[in-house]
Amino acid sequence: MKIFIDTANVEEIRKASKLGVLAGVTTNPSLIAKEGRDIKEVIEEICSIVDGSISAEVMALECDEMVREGRELAKIHKNIVIKIPMCEEGLKAVKVLASEGIRTNVTLIFSPLQALLAARAGASFVSPFLGRLDDIGNPGIEIVTQIAEMFALHGIDTEIISASVRNPMHVLDSAMAGSHIATIPYNVILQMVKHPLTDAGMKKFIEDYNKAFNK
């Protein structure tokens, strides 16, 4: 499973990139708004840091405007993937953009049937939201499992991006369920690095070495 970072914060992306694990970045209007910068400026800078898929989301709610915005965003860099919300107008836009060779990531997926429709419309990626489903009492990982099984059964090439990831367990569960990608906040990536036994082991190695050589 590939690791993406879910943020528009350039410093977080830069730090995570240095770990050598990033295959891409996902952004959304809320994340861009937090940065207080022009979306094109932010996306251009992100593309200069990470050589992988960079999802940039349209703001429009009607097909024609989604397509127009998508075309403009796609011009920024060859790695741009256009993020489209799951809705009737969104599916229409995905079909048009896909016919032009522009990759799309259909977001706000909360059911396997939504994922199926997005895939058949031509989406390159679908993004089921784990955390938000957990919030309403539905185990988010179940949708990832169902989508992965359905896509495998029918030979669908659309990749699954586990989104709304809240903790390391979401990442582990996604990997075991067959998700192709997990897009992860920076703080969760840092949590994945840590384990108390690793820290204790490092401390013990240093203590033993220093004791042996009177350091």
Curated annotation (Swiss-Prot):
GO terms for biological process: carbohydrate metabolic process; pentose-phosphate shunt. The keyword NAD does not apply. Its main location: cytoplasm. Pfam families: TAL_FSA. The active site is at K83 (schiff-base intermediate with substrate). It is found in: Cytoplasm. Pathway: Carbohydrate degradation; pentose phosphate pathway; D-glyceraldehyde 3-phosphate and beta-D-fructose 6-phosphate from D-ribose 5-phosphate and D-xylulose 5-phosphate (non-oxidative stage): step 2/3. GO terms for cellular component: cytoplasm. It comes from the Bacteria. The keyword Transferase applies. Its EC number is 2.2.1.2. It is an enzyme of class 2 (transferase). Keywords: Cytoplasm, Pentose shunt, Schiff base, Transferase. One of its GO terms (molecular function) is transaldolase activity. It catalyses: D-sedoheptulose 7-phosphate + D-glyceraldehyde 3-phosphate = D-erythrose 4-phosphate + beta-D-fructose 6-phosphate. Transaldolase is important for the balance of metabolites in the pentose-phosphate pathway. Belongs to the transaldolase family. Type 3B subfamily. This is Probable transaldolase. The gene is tal.
